[in-house]
Amino acid sequence: MNPTREECSVAPTLFAPHTIRGVTLKNRIVLSPMLTYRAHEGHISDWHLIHLGKFAIGGAGLVFMESTKVDARGCTTAADTGLWDDSFIEPLTHITRFIKRHGAVPGIQLSHSGRKARTSLPWEGRAPAEAERRPDGISPWELIAPSAIPHANGHPMPREMTAADIKELVDAWGKAAARAHAAGFDVVEIHGAHGYLIHQFLNPNANQRTDEYGGNLENRMRFAAEVAKSVRRSWPEDKPLFFRMSAIDNDGWEIEDSVALAKLLRTMGVDVIDCTTGGMAITPVNASVRPLHYGYQVPHAERIRHKAEIETMAVGLIIHAEQAEAILEQGQADLIALGREMLHNPNWPIDAAEKLGLKPSGAMVPDSYGYWLDKRNLSGIGAVPSTWRGGERTQTAKPSSGT
């Protein structure tokens, strides 16, 4: 019989610590940034603390705050979180302190929706919203984009950005990064994917400018590069900078474009490319062009990792522990991001550890939980939970006091 990993004292790669610049993650598991649409005029609430805190307790190494807007006009909905003003800093410190207290690293994604801004909530149909339904601090809720091209039929026409608009937003990203540092975040991710503003500049169909920000690939990458440079200048040298890109979008942006962009961003101080896809084309044909299957975006992370010589994060229908471990072992990516699977099971890291032959420890399960799980495991009734192998703390079973 072969010895287990536990007996060999060899940790799976998924649970090996990983250092980027001056920040060490306890494992390679990342909560992907996901919009929850629970903010009020950009400000967070207890919802965000409880929502994000449970993933830190559940064992993730890096917990990302959702897409947070650098400019009020860039909100996808009126319920987006914001970081365009100093008033947002102090409430966010409660989240970052809690995440750190439970052994995870807090990260935040900074974004602007461009022509995809000003919509109703997803469960309200995501239809164009009236300009009057704006977050506090802007009047009117103006749509801006690289070119005066609407996101889709029936959506309002955005105003083409001027050179002054571009400079203003490049600066806004840098200022938001400085606020993120003040709020206690240790990782920043620039959102350059899913059809939002930076992606709009990259895509030749959304960007039909004739100045230095449009036309050939070099020009279309200029805005992304300037944003990355601005953020890196405002962000501490010892803290990692991520960039999320749609590796392909089925609407004019291809994998070799992403490789070129990743190479450029690496020179701007970006450390990790978060590899997703899509977000620009909105027609039903999208699904047939890019059929979904487990790990369907992983090959893009692998290609960018090796061709651009930069660390990558894989995301998209990664749900099994063995699947995640294989991605890392085969050199396809450096980090594993989970979104909806973590919503389904915030304790996914604990489950994954056991499935990969590790005994979950106090570093993964809070003592407040582990004590009771140990007790149930050793009670002799056979009710062993799937997420815990007990016995580390309690050597003998004792009668329960009921409290």
What are these regions (language model features)?
Residues N2-T403:
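Flavin-dependent oxidoreductase catalytic cores
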